[in-house]
């Protein structure tokens, strides 16, 4: 990454919503949330983003995800670290990567969320546990609107029963993904 591109990765500007971590443009009906996250399920308590998904950051994510630019993993992990530390709030959570459908993982050769979770783990010593599995494939959410994303993501994830014995039920879980837009994937994972 050149210095110019790095300088153009835009942090999420304040004021931040304390729940979804995005710029709070329109207040929500309840204190502590904005109009974007007020409909999230209670199981998804908070979220955070490393940066705005615009300009070079959006190009990097697309290259990482769709062109196999996995050499960006550490750069992206560095950018995600402050947001992850804010969410952890002094605790050591278990990092849970969002799983890909089998066909998509086979096609890409990697799961970008797993790579990012492992990059965060190298920086924090927090454990990574693949607690979720993708129940079914489906269309990519990248070009879908809010309602379509919610419909596709609903019931798409479940707990992987083989992973459960390794986890204390009182553990804090931090779901890791490359992008958060509407929160549909994060909500579906938290509900699993």
Residue ranges: model-predicted function:
Residues 1-192:
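Glycine-rich phosphate/pyrophosphate-handling loop used in enzymes and phosphotransfer proteins
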């Amino acid at each position: 990454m050149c210095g110019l591109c790095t300088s153009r990765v835009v942090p999420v500007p304040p004021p931040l919503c304390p729940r979804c971590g995005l710029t709070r443009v329109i207040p929500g009906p309840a204190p502590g949330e904005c109009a974007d996250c007020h409909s999230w399920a209670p199981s998804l308590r908070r979220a955070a983003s490393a940066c705005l998904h615009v300009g070079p950051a959006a190009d990097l994510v697309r290259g990482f995800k769709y062109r196999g630019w996995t050499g960006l993993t550490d750069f992206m992990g560095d950018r995600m670290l402050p947001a992850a530390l804010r969410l952890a709030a002094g605790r050591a959570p278990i990092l849970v990567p969002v799983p890909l459908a089998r066909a998509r993982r086979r096609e890409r050769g990697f799961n970008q969320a797993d790579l990012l979770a492992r990059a965060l783990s190298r920086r924090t010593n927090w454990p990574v546990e693949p607690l979720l599995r993708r129940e079914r494939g489906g269309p990519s959410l990248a070009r879908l609107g809010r309602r379509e994303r919610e419909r596709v993501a609903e019931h798409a994830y479940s707990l992987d029963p083989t992973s459960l014995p390794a986890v204390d039920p009182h553990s804090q879980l931090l779901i890791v993904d490359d992008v958060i837009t509407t929160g549909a994937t994060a909500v579906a994972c938290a509900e699993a």
